[in-house]
Amino acid sequence: MEVPFKKCDILIPKKGINYNLWSVIACDQYTSQLEYWDKVKELVGDNPSTYNIILPEVYLENEDVEDRIKKINETMNNYLNDDLFETLHDTMIYLERTDSTGKVREGLIGMIDLDSYDYNVGSKSLVRATEKTVIERIPPRKKVRVDAPLELPHIMILIDDEKKEIIESLKNKVTSEDVVYDFDLMMNGGHVKGYKLN
């Protein structure tokens, strides 16, 4: 059986970019709290940030969604043209996320084969949804991606690993030389540390 989770090219901001302002929470969070996103916008200001290249779902009902999508795509192209990114080729990132309570959650960043994914209830596909998909949110998500030169996935995949042999084993395989980022997240989001896997 082919595993639908793979190594890929991962873009990260080059050194000198403020990672705290660059990294924002997923677009499907705080969907009824406009004040959260207003504060993020205020914090980011004119700095490079993923805030400028995602469509927070709190804005989905706004009349200016089409304009926002156009601006997102323009900004993505600007970031690429301005050479903001370093490319980590054919790799995965082992991640340690410390939340605001101090609890550490470990994870792995890579690429998922969307042909193996099915969000329909009762699906037996290799990759399937653990919660109900809000169908109405799919069209604007797809529309953002039509002309987008960058992908900003924000999904979390749960894996069957009863013996804890995958994620847990990685912490013993990385060293301080493998660290590609290590910073506090904005808005009391905790801390994140990423290690490039060789």
For the regions a language model picked out, list residue spans one by one.
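N-terminal extension/subdomain marker
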Residues: M1-H191
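Active-site beta-strand/loop microenvironment that shapes enzyme catalytic pockets
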Residues: Y195-N198
